[in-house]
Amino acid sequence: MSDMNKILHKWSASLKKGTDFDSWGQLVEAIDEYQILARQLQKEAQSPANSSDFTEDQKKTIGKIATCLGLRSAALQYTQSQEGFTLEDVKKLEPILSSIVTFNKEFPFDVQPVPLRRILAPGEEENLEVDEEEEDGGAGIGSPDLFPARVPGTLLPRLPSEPGMTLLTIKIEKIGLKDAGQCIDPYITVSVKDLNGIDLTPVQDTPMATRKEDTYVHFNVEIEIQKHVEKLTKGAAIFFEFKHYKPKKRFTSTKCFAFMEMDEIKPGQTVIELYKKPTDFKRKKLQLLTKKPLYLHLLQTLLKD
């Protein structure tokens, strides 16, 4: 089996796995599988011609499939809605993906690949020159999976309730930044880490901000933490990384981050401080982003069965 056939076989198996989860009603697993495959397809679609076995037309089709998977992921996050990209729509992608080399028909959906943005290896951003108008602090990276072409909005549904267990919903209301109006395509990556910086739950991205005004970027979006509060390990923390797109350099950058520790989990309004990048998941060398009264504004809701 050639390398290309191996890749196509791997992608097809991943898509089948996602549609199986989808048809079984295992939404969290389906979303995760779709998003993993979408990232792989986006990476291939954006690869230089001299490092890809696929033609430019084939890569365009691959990019469109990635967009469709992102649309299905978004549809699954809002299970009350009967609209959006359906499971039957996704199944129409299976024969296209498996025969991408010979596919020469019109793509069945009116979508476009995610716009080309530079893909950075972890740590690469550290070596790039920082703009003078950049935020206070040096350059750095956020999550290890810094991937500028992620489909915006990868929120997961609420976990099933369990007797005696507490579910946590965090509404990200707004973030205060001195140059809020200049941020392009801003979103927040939410992760739950242990003391060693290891993920305890799937990483989630908010959709892009709803509006910007003065010194605030508004999100007004709810995040369902993917672990019952009682099951979070001692010393764990919930991280919020604010990211935005830099058109001059064509990549998405982490601007700052905030975190909330376990003793801060309580119902009601919460305001937490912002720190300079790079994101310090181990919380050992923290530096405040600014001395100005600018914070991340949250609203916590606890639900116990």
From Swiss-Prot:
Region (Axin-binding): 153-220
PROSITE patterns noted in UniProt: C2_AIDA
GO terms for MF: phosphatidylinositol binding
Domain of life: Eukaryota
Sequence ranges assigned to domain C2 Aida-type in this UniProt record: 156-303
Keywords assigned by UniProt, alphabetized: Developmental protein
GO BP, one annotated term: determination of ventral identity
Gene3D superfamilies: Axin interactor, dorsalization-associated protein, N-terminal domain, C2 domain
One GO CC term on file: membrane
Family: Belongs to the AIDA family.
Summary of the function given for this chain in its UniProt record: Acts as a ventralizing factor during embryogenesis. Inhibits axin-mediated JNK activation by binding axin and disrupting axin homodimerization. This in turn antagonizes a Wnt/beta-catenin-independent dorsalization pathway activated by axin/JNK-signaling.
Name listed for the protein in its UniProt record: Axin interactor, dorsalization-associated protein A
Organism the protein comes from: Xenopus laevis
